[in-house]
Amino acid sequence: MLEHVKTQIRRFYDWGFRLIKHDFSSIDLCGLWGKDMKFFATGLPFADQTVTTAEVVLHFYEAIREAAQDAVVIGCNTFPHLLAGLAELNRTGDDTSGYDWNRTRRMGVNTLAFRMPQNRTFYMSDADCVGIRPAGDVPWALNKEWLRLLARSGAPLFVSCDPKAATPEVRATLTEAFRINAVQTDEAEPLDWLDNTCPADWKINGQTEHFHWYDELGYNAALDPEK
């Protein structure tokens, strides 16, 4: 199996890809999402019962790293402490959304805050992207706050933008955000993390800043299709 994995990764490399992302390996290997795992991930053993689950996972990550050569590797749905040193970046949270702001707030802001200690320690910690769609989905004012924090977090910045939503203001704001993030000299630390699951107060380069994760009414249920 490891040779098969290497063959596939080498193929991507030979095609010219220099940014390779692997995803869903933890659920493929263990049969469960991390949040659903108890003491045992699965009742089924691996074919080689002389190695532990951790060793199986580590060998898998090492195979990808070897085959990717000098390409940048992004992990996703991984075991962070085992991936450390074997990928330049790692998606550390679930998907954010261009449709549902509450999902971005829960999966993006929360992830950035509580997985920040891994950034530049295990790898660059990717809290997922800013999803920008035309008016009627997530308000630009809220997405702009998320973009402002990500750009200055010292963590990677990714954006998924519908061209129809790329107004002159959006383009100018994105250009400035990428200019800031490309330097990667900023340091950000959540301050109210003990009593806020989506920290709004951050220390950025030694200065305290406040971010607004709610609309003017506090919380707008219309932005959360799941509720």
Give short role names for the model-derived ranges.
Residues 150-153, 157-158, 191-227:
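Carbohydrate-binding surface patches
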Residues 183-190:
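N-terminal low-complexity/IDR leader segments of large eukaryotic scaffold/assembly proteins
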Residues 3, 7, 66, 149, ...:
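Polar/charged alpha-helical tracts
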Residues 84-86, 134-136, 161-164, 222-224:
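Short conserved micro-motifs at the rims of enzyme active sites and ligand-binding pockets
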Residues 1-137, 142, 170:
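Aromatic- and carboxylate-enriched substrate-binding clefts and catalytic-loop regions
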Residues 14-16, 68, 146, 152-153, ...:
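Short, well-ordered loop/turn elements at secondary-structure boundaries
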Residues 26-27, 79-81, 157, 164, ...:
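Short, solvent-exposed loop/turn segments at secondary-structure junctions
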Residues 148-183:
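Catalytic cores of secreted or luminal carbohydrate-active enzymes
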